[in-house]
Swiss-Prot record:
Interacts with the terminase subunits TRM1 and TRM2. Interacts with portal protein. Component of the molecular motor that translocates viral genomic DNA in empty capsid during DNA packaging. Forms a tripartite terminase complex together with TRM1 and TRM2 in the host cytoplasm. Once the complex reaches the host nucleus, it interacts with the capsid portal vertex. This portal forms a ring in which genomic DNA is translocated into the capsid. TRM3 carries an RNase H-like nuclease activity that plays an important role for the cleavage of concatemeric viral DNA into unit length genomes. Its EC number is 3.1.-.-. This is Tripartite terminase subunit 3. It is found in: Host nucleus. It comes from Human herpesvirus 6B (strain Z29) (HHV-6 variant B). One of its GO terms (cellular component) is host cell nucleus. The active site is at E305 (for atpase activity), D458 (for nuclease activity), E529 (for nuclease activity), D643 (for nuclease activity). The gene is TRM3.
């Protein structure tokens, strides 16, 4: 006979032993931070790492995030602390708390925190994440192949949606704690509360182009859920019987190969993994036999190729919506040429943000794929393409030869777009360019800045301010980004002045001012456009060099182009590369790779006018012109010229290219 207290003691010891190998051991410090506090109770907060502290520490985001992240790390590496900080910390003295009850409160609080790490369902979720991490690292591959698996963004999104919902429904009492843990595991601390609520909602729709690994990714999700989450019930519905049968056999094969120690059965389209006290099941059905899913209590229902599911079967699937513990994932490709097979796109207007669309073209530029013969990507180029996907002009031509419109409808993804919108510059890009500027005289930033200054000069020999002026732009690099150091939009005061001298002095004045503020530049590379007047371009180059070398000891080189006699001259002839330069600029601008310096130099733009805002006005005017299937770009509008923006675009384009051999001294 055992006494009750002995039974409890033995049970606790037994559980501690059997969980020892699997448990994600808590790294919470058990040492009581004994420090006195001198403020009211309502201002006190209690955390495992800080003990009793003032509640304003919750607003110190780096501190609070660091504490939470360290709390969830299993094997923490020793932290490296600067010696000066160590000395300062050692000098700090804390008075011990006089109230002994604080220590008992802290101990009780710590025990409540450790409940999560002892919760069996938490250990199951953690086991699922560990197995998935091993699979990504290639540890489950056959024949010694240890190559890592690279997940696409939409696949990561599906994984997070699945595990977040299961965590919330399986552990409702500890939902906030486990969600906090998962945000650290998946490294998504930056997401806000609204996004977290989206991850936890019951229904989500993923529309992804064909051949991108939708069905392939479902197999490991089902396999690892069956292995780790005890008692889970999964449903899988496909548009064809052979698809559901194939997925079922793949799941069975992977489970038997990866988990040979588990008891696995496959009978009547149901795969079962037998745990000690309960079974985990996955049922596979086609839309022609939805009777098998009626009356089930799924935790996860995956509807593959949802756009091609019979409408009668959809009624049965939607019957699971009222079930609070069921997550429904609609995953499908899109035939956007047919509204009957793209009806899920209507959810784009849903207030619940349940629709995620993967496409190679945004709605603003979908029409351009038809207008441009060889175009195969969105003109804003915010694109992530897997390495196993090849989309080029030949693929487009071949697809459209078989079936008119097949390229845009079957391959590119997205929805039928009847709205034509020629907006090339995104609002996000404009906002980032206007407000996020680097301080290029910051000593911590200087080591990462490029040591070459590129200056593009587009001269205009007219005094008509309504026509055009001289655009000058100075560009440098910061890692893979481009920084605007200076810009000028110069108009001749009158035709009586020497236009060559005035333009050259304006450019030299800007360059010298930039060099005064940024002495780290070792070379100035100047590009003078010679399309209007080659002789004047050569004269401008000579005057600029004379002005700079008289004031600064720095190497000055000019872009050289062979003339009719094959003699290299210091000017640049702008040709068809202007189109490529504009597209390169648009892609980098929209991706946030073009920034302005806080110490930007400009003498010709009014003091009351921010030069960056002045440049933005011209950037917003960039538009596409299509004439006889030939595409070009312009930023000219009725009351606005494009001289400055063309200079910026070309300076960035030349800076990005491998054109060092074309720069020579004169």
């Amino acid at each position: 006979m055992l006494r009750t207290c002995d039974i409890t003691h033995i049970k606790n010891n037994y559980e501690a032993i059997i969980w020892k190998g699997e448990r994600n051991c808590s790294t919470i410090s058990t040492k009581y931070p004994n420090s006195a506090i001198f403020y009211k109770k309502r201002f006190i907060m209690l955390t495992p790492e800080l003990g009793f502290a003032h509640s304003y520490n919750q607003q110190v985001k780096p501190l609070y995030t660091f504490c939470e992240k360290q709390r969830h790390l299993k094997n923490r590496k020793p932290l490296t602390i600067l010696p000066s900080l160590t000395r300062k910390l050692q000098e700090m003295k804390f008075l011990p708390a006089s109230d002994k009850s604080f220590e008992s409160q802290y101990t009780e609080f710590l025990e409540s925190f450790k409940i999560l790490y002892r919760e069996p369902l938490f250990l199951q979720i953690d086991g699922f994440i560990k197995d998935f991490r091993k699979w990504i690292k290639g540890e489950f591959n056959d024949f010694g192949d240890t190559r890592k698996i690279q997940l696409e963004p939409f696949q990561k999104n599906i994984l997070i949606h699945v595990i977040f919902f299961i965590a919330v429904t399986k552990l409702p009492a500890l939902a906030n704690r486990v969600i906090n843990y998962l945000t650290h595991v998946f490294d998504i601390e930056f997401v806000n509360e609204s996004t977290l609520n989206t991850l936890k909602q019951k229904t989500n729709v993923f529309l992804v182009p064909r051949r991108h690994g939708k069905t392939w990714f479902i197999v490991p999700i089902i396999s690892f859920l069956l292995k780790n989450i005890e008692g889970i019930s999964i449903g899988y519905v496909a548009h064809q019987k052979h698809v559901s049968h194939f997925v079922m056999k793949e799941v069975e094969f992977k489970c038997r190969r990866m988990f040979p120690e588990k008891t696995i059965t496959c009978l009547d389209n149901v795969i079962t993994i037998d745990h000690q006290n309960i079974k985990s099941t996955a049922l596979f059905a086609s839309c022609y036999n939805t009777h098998s899913i009626r009356g089930q209590s799924f935790n996860l229902l995956i509807v593959d190729e949802s756009h091609f599911i019979k409408k009668d079967a959809f009624s049965t699937i939607l019957g699971f919506l009222p079930q609070a513990s069921t997550k429904i994932l609609f995953i499908s490709s899109t035939n956007s040429g047919n509204h009957s097979t793209s009806f899920l796109m209507k959810l784009n207007n849903s207030p619940f943000e349940m629709l995620s669309v993967v496409s190679y073209v945004c709605e603003d530029h979908a029409h351009m794929l038809n207008e441009r013969g060889n175009a195969t990507a969105c003109s804003c180029y915010r694109l992530h393409k897997p390495k196993f996907i090849s989309i080029n002009a030949e693929v487009k031509k071949t697809a459209n030869l078989f079936l008119e419109g097949a390229f845009i409808h079957e391959i590119m993804g997205g929805a039928t777009c009847n709205v034509i919108n020629d907006v090339l510059i995104t609002e996000q890009g404009q906002t980032e360019f206007e407000f996020f500027r680097y301080s290029t005289i910051n000593k911590n930033l200087i080591p990462f800045l490029g040591k070459d200054l590129y200056v593009y000069l587009d001269p205009a020999y007219t005094g008509n301010r309504r026509a055009s002026g001289t655009g000058i732009a100075a560009i440098g690099t910061y890692l893979d980004q481009y920084i605007v150091y200076g810009m000028e939009h110069y108009f001749l005061e009158s035709l009586m002045t020497s236009s060559d001298t005035a333009i050259a002095e304006c450019a030299a004045h800007m360059i010298l001012s930039i060099l005064d503020l940024h002495p780290f530049f070792t070379e100035v590379k100047i590009i003078i456009e010679g399309n209007s007047n080659q002789a004047s371009a050569v004269k401008i180059a000579c005057i600029i060099k004379e002005n700079i070398t008289a004031n600064k000891s720095i190497q000055v080189t000019f872009f050289h182009t062979p003339d009719q006699n094959q003699i290299a001259q210091p000017f640049y002839l702008l040709g068809k590369e202007k189109k490529l330069a504009v597209e390169f600029f648009i892609s980098n601008f929209n991706s946030g790779n073009i920034k302005a310096s806080q110490e930007l130099i400009s003498f010709t733009i009014k003091i009351t006018y921010d030069p960056v805002e002045y440049a933005l006005e011209q950037i917003r005017n960039i538009h596409q012109i299509s004439v006889n299937n030939y595409i070009t770009y312009s930023a000219k509008k009725q009351a606005c010229s494009d001289d400055l923006i063309i200079a910026i675009i070309m300076a960035i384009y030349v800076c990005s290219g491998n054109s060092s051999a074309s720069f020579r001294e004169i």
